[in-house]
């Protein structure tokens, strides 16, 4: 028998089956694919309808389960893509698709279950070590500072070192747990726990941090605004619900409304933040230079790892904080180069609250704002950054008129300077033949005035 006949014979058999209870090839293949590995029992959803157990999944006497209807399949896909919790890795979703309604931690894979046992043993060892280190801290706290060689400073340094080691053990205890990874991939991680903060920071530094660091160097934020700066928190920018990539040029009608910041800190505890938005490219015609303008400033904003969204429009109203300068829409006059709008997040010293009246007094004028001087006066530490750019567009004049900003009719042009070189004598074949003796050739020669 030829190879073609061997391949075609099963297809012909499938086509000849015309009975109402006969299974087609496609249905039988689905039934074979739906069989759970490492088990000969039916799936949970089929236990009510199935009364016998079959050892061979391809037995011709067994009627395969019916295919789901188009409506059910469409609902399942929509559940997964739009609102369902299964947003993690494709490998995990593929494993869940072949195991029915089993819980994630009970997947019937021998290797998976053996790995979970090893991870549980390792976690128990880490927890025992955490208890041991906690007892050490209690003993050190009970001792007098005079017993340490460096006094109270050495005692606090030792306690701080042990607490840092305990935080590392907490991360190592759960970093490989499949359930922890699943929650983090699905966006349901508890940021009050160190393991989720560690995973979030690792993901941020893998790409988003590199992009922000590149923009800081590419747009010369350092040293134009600060002598040195390395961000340590994630800050994302969105206008009217749409996230903006760092450094994007936005329409002035979009930036007319104050943005929303998605901020994520990676260390525990509550702190007070200050948000500053600066235009670092305001033309200064008098001095033929550029100056800076403050477009927004708010201080004393409480923040912790569990918070993620800050609407600048809500500061001082629904969100606690003191507004030094409300939002001023970014604008650029016609002919000027693009303006860099820098969004800085600065952390205040623990327990140090900025006086609102002193803040407003320091910012009586938006122009000539110095971030370096503001930072030194109020003892702030820059921790987060993002930026966008603004140019003159068809809606800039309307935005400036609505908010009472003068200068919409101003247009910047490059100033032309007369050359300081003396006039150059004409040279070339035509220049030599401008004399009267070449008058017969003038009709062929270009006249040079």
Swiss-Prot record:
<protein>
    <recommendedName>
        <fullName>Large ribosomal subunit protein mL38</fullName>
    </recommendedName>
</protein>
<comment type="similarity">
    <text>Belongs to the phosphatidylethanolamine-binding protein family. Mitochondrion-specific ribosomal protein mL38 subfamily.</text>
</comment>
<keyword id="KW-0496">Mitochondrion</keyword>
<dbReference type="InterPro" id="IPR036610">
    <property type="entry name" value="PEBP-like_sf"/>
</dbReference>
<comment type="function">
    <text>Component of the mitochondrial ribosome (mitoribosome), a dedicated translation machinery responsible for the synthesis of mitochondrial genome-encoded proteins, including at least some of the essential transmembrane subunits of the mitochondrial respiratory chain. The mitoribosomes are attached to the mitochondrial inner membrane and translation products are cotranslationally integrated into the membrane.</text>
</comment>
<dbReference type="InterPro" id="IPR008914">
    <property type="entry name" value="PEBP"/>
</dbReference>
<dbReference type="InterPro" id="IPR035810">
    <property type="entry name" value="PEBP_euk"/>
</dbReference>
<dbReference type="GO" id="GO:0005739">
    <property type="term" value="C:mitochondrion"/>
</dbReference>
<dbReference type="Pfam" id="PF01161">
    <property type="entry name" value="PBP"/>
</dbReference>
<comment type="subunit">
    <text>Component of the mitochondrial large ribosomal subunit (mt-LSU). Mature N.crassa 74S mitochondrial ribosomes consist of a small (37S) and a large (54S) subunit. The 37S small subunit contains a 16S ribosomal RNA (16S mt-rRNA) and 32 different proteins. The 54S large subunit contains a 23S rRNA (23S mt-rRNA) and 42 different proteins.</text>
</comment>
<feature type="compositionally biased region" description="Low complexity">
    <location>
        <begin position="50"/>
        <end position="62"/>
    </location>
</feature>
<feature type="region of interest" description="Disordered">
    <location>
        <begin position="37"/>
        <end position="72"/>
    </location>
</feature>
């Amino acid at each position: 028998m030829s190879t073609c006949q061997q391949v075609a014979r099963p297809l012909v058999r499938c086509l000849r089956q015309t009975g109402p209870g006969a299974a087609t090839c496609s249905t039988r293949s689905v039934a074979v694919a739906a069989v759970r590995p490492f088990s000969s029992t039916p799936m949970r959803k089929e236990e009510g309808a199935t009364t016998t157990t079959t050892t061979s999944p391809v037995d011709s006497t067994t009627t395969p389960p019916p295919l789901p209807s188009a409506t059910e399949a469409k609902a399942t896909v929509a559940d997964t893509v739009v609102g369902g919790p299964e947003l993690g890795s494709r490998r995990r979703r593929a494993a869940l698709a072949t195991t029915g309604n089993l819980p994630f931690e009970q997947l019937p894979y021998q290797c998976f279950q053996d790995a979970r046992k090893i991870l549980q043993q390792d976690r128990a060892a880490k927890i025992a070590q955490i208890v041991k280190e906690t007892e050490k801290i209690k003993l050190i706290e009970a001792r007098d500072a005079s017993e340490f060689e460096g006094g109270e400073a050495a005692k606090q340094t030792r306690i701080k070192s042990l607490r840092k080691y305990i935080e590392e053990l907490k991360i190592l205890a759960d970093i490989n747990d499949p359930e922890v990874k699943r929650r983090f991939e699905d966006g349901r991680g508890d940021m009050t726990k160190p393991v989720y903060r560690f995973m979030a920071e690792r993901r941020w530094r893998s790409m988003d941090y590199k992009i922000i660091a590149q923009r800081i160097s590419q747009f010369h934020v350092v040293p134009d605004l600060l002598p040195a700066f390395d961000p340590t928190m994630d800050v994302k920018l969105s206008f009217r619900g749409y996230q903006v990539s760092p450094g994007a040029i936005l329409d002035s009608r979009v930036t007319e409304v104050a943005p929303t910041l998605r901020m994520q800190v990676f260390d525990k505890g509550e702190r007070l933040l200050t948000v500053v938005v600066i235009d670092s490219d305001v033309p200064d015609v008098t001095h033929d230079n550029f100056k800076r303008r403050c477009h927004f400033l708010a201080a004393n904003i409480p923040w912790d790892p569990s918070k993620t969204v800050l609407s600048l429009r809500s500061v001082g109203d629904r969100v606690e904080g003191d507004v030094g300068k409300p939002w001023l829409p970014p604008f650029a006059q016609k002919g000027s180069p693009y303006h860099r709008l820098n969004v800085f997040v600065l952390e205040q010293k623990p327990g140090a609250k900025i006086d609102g009246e002193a803040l407003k007094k320091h910012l009586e004028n938006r122009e000539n704002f110095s971030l370096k001087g503001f930072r030194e006066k109020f003892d702030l530490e820059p921790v987060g950054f993002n930026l966008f750019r603004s140019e003159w567009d068809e809606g800039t004049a309307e935005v400036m008129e609505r908010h009472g900003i003068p200068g919409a009719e101003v247009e910047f042009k490059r100033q032309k300077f007369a050359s300081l070189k003396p006039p150059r004598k004409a040279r070339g074949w035509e220049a030599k033949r401008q004399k009267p003796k070449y008058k017969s050739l003038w009709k062929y020669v270009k006249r040079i005035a």
